[in-house]
């Protein structure tokens, strides 16, 4: 089953601590800001959208597009990852769809695709004014988390926060 394969892959990724092999988004953005690059933020755009976004940006052969995967701050909430500077555009459509209580598949998924399309169009428009545009996100998200029936109890004395997205461990 796909869910079992995904869970196994995630477990292996966590066990090997692969997260720490990625550069921090903060460091990458600091370098880009020094060189005057236009930064375009997308709230809640996870890595699962890279294929579609890359295709939309490069399908006409006019844009040189490279992908660099980085890590955000833990916990992966907007509050912990608000690194946008004044004047940097922020697209919130994906986050709005994900947090909408009437999320229905496939309608909400199709709306998310439309948001990614609008992100690509906006990035292409920005490229008419800037030589380089970096598209980045504060965090990703997954419907898998909220639709899974499997629940994991936090360790003793841990306090679950952000509707169970993460837990703060005790001081001992």
Task: Go through each PLM region and give its residues.
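Feature captures the catalytic ectodomains and active-site-proximal regions of enzymes
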Residues: 1-172
């Amino acid at each position: 089953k796909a869910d079992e394969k995904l869970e196994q892959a995630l477990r292996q990724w966590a066990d090997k601590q692969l997260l720490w092999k990625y550069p921090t988004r903060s460091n990458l953005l600091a370098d880009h800001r020094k060189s005057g690059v236009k930064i375009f933020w997308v709230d809640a755009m996870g890595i699962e959208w890279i294929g579609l976004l890359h295709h939309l940006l490069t399908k006409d052969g006019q844009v040189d597009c490279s992908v660099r995967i980085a890590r955000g701050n833990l916990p992966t909430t907007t509050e912990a990852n608000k690194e946008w500077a004044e004047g940097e555009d922020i697209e919130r459509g994906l986050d709005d769809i994900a947090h909408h209580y009437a999320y229905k598949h496939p309608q909400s998924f199709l709306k998310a695709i439309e948001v990614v399309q609008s992100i690509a169009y906006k990035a292409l428009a920005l490229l008419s004014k800037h030589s380089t545009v970096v598209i980045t996100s504060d965090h990703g998200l997954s419907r898998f988390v909220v639709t899974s029936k499997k629940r994991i109890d936090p360790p003793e004395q841990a306090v679950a926060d952000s509707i169970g997205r993460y837990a703060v461990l005790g001081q001992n």
